[in-house]
């Protein structure tokens, strides 16, 4: 009963955040429309031109603000001793490998961009975290001021004036969505991360661990080969926030990379508890691993179908190019459905994704798990053939 109530509370909080985010964007849209009507801009440019301006402006300024937001994280990080690892806008990622920048494709549900850095060494029980996390919102603030200034400097040109006003208002919306502590989509926003880190040094440590894991991944070091102390589970209280719960998720990924399926299942079951702040995208990841473990173990159809909830299927559509998802779907087709042709299609898709994936060490681990699936399928076929021959004799 308690767990059910906690789960409902998490879902309600997420829905409230979604509605609040939508209301912020709607409010900015209304403000822009009212401003253009009151200042006669709509009369000057016409309704159709205004709609075109809105469409072009929203798309253009959304990308501009996302780029500037991530650039703000980069500048904030560099000013406080962080080192560049990767910079992503949409699914395009620039990542440092062996001292050189290379372009790869990577996407994460709930994020329009991401700037990941290697943090300073852990000293005196802390690291600087405020400027790196707040840098994005601060950069959006500076951009808003610049766009409003441009709007008033170009006040005689109606459509340009309206265009830059739109850029400023959209920037305010993004500042509020990223700065007010809440979970946006499937991830915590910058404000929420800052709030949790200001409350607990243990959360700062969890933040540091996540960045270090990512930095080591970029150096092609597999998670199974990283220091064990990074994966010690935080307290139950600490894991009520997403930053600390992510360490538990990473511990599960490490167990999978070590091929320790019993430990991985134990950790996944634990991190899926409703009282933990495990983010929706991480809950999807954990459930995917549980499906894989079930396929490699007892392979019970009813258990597999129970994992594939409506929420899981929603994420599955978004994460269709994720290597772990493709590996698990491959196992489902081969071991669950006994359909090698369908499995081969998924394996071909995996190879396409692997060719442009930024973390080669993760692909190496996925290939090892795929090989385990193939070995199990081969063994089960041999058992069937052996039983058939025995029966015929």
Feature locations, PLM:
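Topogenic membrane-insertion module of multi-pass membrane proteins
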Residues: 2-58
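Alpha-helical linker/edge segments of TPR/alpha-solenoid repeat scaffolds
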Residues: 291-305, 332-342, 370-393
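Alpha-helical repeat scaffolds
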Residues: 225-235, 261-274, 299-316, 339-353, ...
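Small-residue-rich helix-interface/hinge motifs
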Residues: 57-120
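Polar-ligand-bearing catalytic/cofactor-coordination segments
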Residues: 79, 88, 114-123, 182-259, ...
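Membrane-embedded alpha-helical segments that form the functional core of polytopic membrane enzymes
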Residues: 47-67, 161-176
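Alpha-helical adaptor scaffolds
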Residues: 253, 257, 278-322, 326-327, ...
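Hydrophobic transmembrane alpha-helical segments that form the core helix bundle
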Residues: 120-218
């Amino acid at each position: 009963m308690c767990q059910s109530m906690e789960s409902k509370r998490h879902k309600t909080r997420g829905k409230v955040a979604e509605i609040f985010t939508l209301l912020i964007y709607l409010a900015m849209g209304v403000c822009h429309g009212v401003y253009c009507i009151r200042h006669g801009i709509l009369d000057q440019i016409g309704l159709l031109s205004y709609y075109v301006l809105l469409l072009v402006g929203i798309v253009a300024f959304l990308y501009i603000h996302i780029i500037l937001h991530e650039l703000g994280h980069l500048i904030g990080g560099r000013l406080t001793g962080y080192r560049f690892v990767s910079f992503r806008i949409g699914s395009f990622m620039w990542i440092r490998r062996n001292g050189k920048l290379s372009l790869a494709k990577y996407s994460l549900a709930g994020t329009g961009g991401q700037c990941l850095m290697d943090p300073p060494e852990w000293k005196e029980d802390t690291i600087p975290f405020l400027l790196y996390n707040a840098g994005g919102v601060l950069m959006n603030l500076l951009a808003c001021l610049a766009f409003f200034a441009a709007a008033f400097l170009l006040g005689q040109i109606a459509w340009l004036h309206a265009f830059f006003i739109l850029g400023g208002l959209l920037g305010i919306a993004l500042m509020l969505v990223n700065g007010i502590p809440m979970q946006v989509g499937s991830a915590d926003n910058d404000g929420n991360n800052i709030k949790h880190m200001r409350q607990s040094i243990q959360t700062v440590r969890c933040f540091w661990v996540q960045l270090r894991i990512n930095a080591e991944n970029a150096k092609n070091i597999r998670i199974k080969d990283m220091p064990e102390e990074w994966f010690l589970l935080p307290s139950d209280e600490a894991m009520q926030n997403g930053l600390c719960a992510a360490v538990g998720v990473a511990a599960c990924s490490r167990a999978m990379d070590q091929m320790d399926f019993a430990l991985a299942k134990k950790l996944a079951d634990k991190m899926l508890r409703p009282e933990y702040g495990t983010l929706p995208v991480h809950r999807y990841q954990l459930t995917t691993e549980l499906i894989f473990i079930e396929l490699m173990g007892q392979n019970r159809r009813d258990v597999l179908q129970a994992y594939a909830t409506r929420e899981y299927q929603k994420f599955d559509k978004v994460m269709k190019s994720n290597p772990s998802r493709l590996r698990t779907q491959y196992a489902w087709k081969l071991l669950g459905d006994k359909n090698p042709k369908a499995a081969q299609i998924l394996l071909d898709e995996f190879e396409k994704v692997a060719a442009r994936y930024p973390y080669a060490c993760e692909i190496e681990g996925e290939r090892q798990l795929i090989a385990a699936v193939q070995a199990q399928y081969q063994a089960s076929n041999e058992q069937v053939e052996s039983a058939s021959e025995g029966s015929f004799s």
